[in-house]
From Swiss-Prot:
Region spans: rRNA-recognition domain, N-terminus: 2-98
Pfam family, one: RF-1
Region (Linker 2): 162-179
Designated name of the protein: Peptide chain release factor homolog
Similarity remark: Belongs to the prokaryotic/mitochondrial release factor family.
Entry remark concerning the domains of this protein: Folds similarly to release factors 1 and 2 (RF1 and RF2).
GO biological process, any: RNA repair
GGQ motif (motif): residue ranges: 120-122
Family matches, as PANTHER family: LD18447P, PEPTIDE CHAIN RELEASE FACTOR HOMOLOG-RELATED
Span list, region Linker 1: 99-107
Superkingdom field: Bacteria
Alphabetical UniProt keywords: Protein biosynthesis, RNA repair, RNA-binding, rRNA-binding
Amino acid sequence: MILLQLSSAQGPEECCLAVRKALDRLIKEATRQDVAVTVLETETGRYSDTLRSALISLDGDNAWALSESWCGTIQWICPSPYRPHHGRKNWFLGIGRFTADEQEQSDAIRYETLRSSGPGGQHVNKTDSAVRATHLASGISVKVQSERSQHANKRLARLLIAWKLEQQQQENSAALKSQRRMFHHQIERGNPRRTFTGMAFIEG
């Protein structure tokens, strides 16, 4: 199981629209490659159809190859739909990958099983597959009910906790804070992994 974070990296609303379009495209590619995608967290932009960032999980035999094809800088070439007279046509987003050793923190996590709620059909409503996991040392807690089995939810919970711990460590590091402020600049100067064109988000 892999986590991918899509980020506009403090870019303008056009970059946030690019995040939304990239996420939609990624989900379609995952479906074609039999990779299960779960959208875990999103931060909306100024407009309803935009995303400042999105955190997703990928699971399946082709998950690594799919993530490899997306990680890095993504370029979107399109006139601004929000500022018609704006001269800029190149917009960028960044996609980062996170994996963790599933056994590394298993002893430091307390699990509670819960009855799943919300959409998911009869199977979800009749099983206690949802999991709340708490990292004892930090107090970080996550609830996962997106997978169909308790085992899969525990795997995703461990990965989410590991990701949140890394984010916490980054926030506590002055040097890494500085690196994150430079992220947008680095994205724009980097060679794009993939390039898409127009509102239809066509690759080429």
